């Protein structure tokens, strides 16, 4: 399960992060110099986390705002599309919410059309393919990002009963295949994890802790190649942050959370 392979055009191909994943998932043989290097990286982050965690939580509060400049691009290899044909690209673009604001598109490689009003905001661009040349779509943008802290005690204090007949509740506790799985296996596993606990906030914490203890982080193969991500995590015993999040969501929804 550490060494992920795929048969592609009759050839066995190894996932490019196989070696690093093997090290991450086998602590006994993890090179000491890598462990020390990781500790140094984490040490740089800890003071920032401690500063944010000391902020007092108030309703909708966001603290420690930082301005970020970003460059995002995608490049289509030369001659992947016949010369003269139009290549259309949709690049992901952030949008305002509680933790990010003041987005500004600074530049783009071609005319950009920004979508809004959907869950997935994008910038649309198109270019003609040129023989022998790669086609690059690029945009530069800036925005501000802030931190929010949610303490369990505050969440428990403000907890209200669910309206289980509401469309909102039904929507966010429903199965959404292929990657939000609510079936007998998930329900049984979720109930086993939480035991006799009935408070949904504490149930969510128990499930979070269980996943953290049992499914270590490792680099992920492309999500589009995985038929059902939460089941994949259960089968392979590891996952990256997005993969274990989908397992977490599936287990919560299985309990009606």
Regions found by a protein language model. Name each.
Residues 1-150, 154-156:
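Intrinsically disordered, low-complexity N-terminal segments that are enriched in acidic
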């Amino acid at each position: 399960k550490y060494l992920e392979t795929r048969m592609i055009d009759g050839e066995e191909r190894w996932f490019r992060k196989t070696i690093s994943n093997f090290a991450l998932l086998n602590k006994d043989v993890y090179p000491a110099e890598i462990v020390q290097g990781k500790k140094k990286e984490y040490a740089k982050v800890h003071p920032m986390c401690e500063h944010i965690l000391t902020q007092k939580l108030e309703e909708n509060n966001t603290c420690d705002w930082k301005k970020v400049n970003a460059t995002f691009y995608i490049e289509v290899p030369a001659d992947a599309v016949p010369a003269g044909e139009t290549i259309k690209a949709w690049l992901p673009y952030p949008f305002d919410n509680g933790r990010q604001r003041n987005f500004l598109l600074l530049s783009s490689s071609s005319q950009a059309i920004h979508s809004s009003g959907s869950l997935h905001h994008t910038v649309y661009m198109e270019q003609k393919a040129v023989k022998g040349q790669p086609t690059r779509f690029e945009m530069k943008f800036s925005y501000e990002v802030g931190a929010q802290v949610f303490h369990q005690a505050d969440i428990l204090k403000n907890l209200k009963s669910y309206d289980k007949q509401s469309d909102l509740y039904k929507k966010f506790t429903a199965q959404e295949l292929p990657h939000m799985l609510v079936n007998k296996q998930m329900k049984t596993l979720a109930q086993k994890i939480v035991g006799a606990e009935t408070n949904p906030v504490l149930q969510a914490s128990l499930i979070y802790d269980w996943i953290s203890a049992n499914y270590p982080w490792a680099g992920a193969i492309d999500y589009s190649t995985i038929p059902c991500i939460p089941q994949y995590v259960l089968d392979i015993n590891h996952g990256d942050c997005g993969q274990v999040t989908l397992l977490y969501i599936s287990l919560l929804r299985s309990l009606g959370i």
